[in-house]
């Protein structure tokens, strides 16, 4: 356990930041799942709307260092590709 007051404060801050980061990470995953759900249902319009919201949340995660830029780009690219194939197939 931390003995110095600065170390105790750092430990408190770490706990607080960890909770915030987990919340943000969970929110990003939830928005990605919403897009995947709309794609599985075949709703083009809803999938596009969900993608725009998810893309915004993913990029906010990049800005807050929750996920890396390349990871975010890969996720957005794969979701966009699925929606594009959905649009072409129907």
Swiss-Prot record:
Gene Ontology biological-process annotations: translation
A GO MF label: small ribosomal subunit rRNA binding
InterPro entries per UniProt: Ribosomal_bS20, Ribosomal_bS20_sf
Any one cellular-component term (Gene Ontology): small ribosomal subunit
Keywords: Ribonucleoprotein, Ribosomal protein, RNA-binding, rRNA-binding
Function comment: Binds directly to 16S ribosomal RNA.
Gene3D superfamilies reported in the protein's UniProt record: Ribosomal protein S20
Keyword Chloroplast: no
Family designation: Belongs to the bacterial ribosomal protein bS20 family.
UniProt protein name: Small ribosomal subunit protein bS20
Originating gene: rpsT
Lineage top rank: taxon: Bacteria
């Amino acid at each position: 356990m931390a003995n110095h007051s600065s170390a105790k404060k750092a430990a408190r801050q770490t706990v607080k930041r960890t909770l915030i980061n987990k919340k943000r990470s969970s929110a990003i995953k939830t928005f990605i799942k919403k897009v995947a759900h709309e794609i599985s249902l075949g709703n083009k319009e809803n999938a596009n709307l969900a993608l725009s919201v998810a893309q915004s949340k993913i990029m906010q995660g990049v800005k807050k260092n929750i996920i890396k830029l390349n990871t975010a780009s890969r996720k957005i690219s794969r979701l966009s590709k699925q929606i594009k194939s959905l649009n072409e197939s129907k």
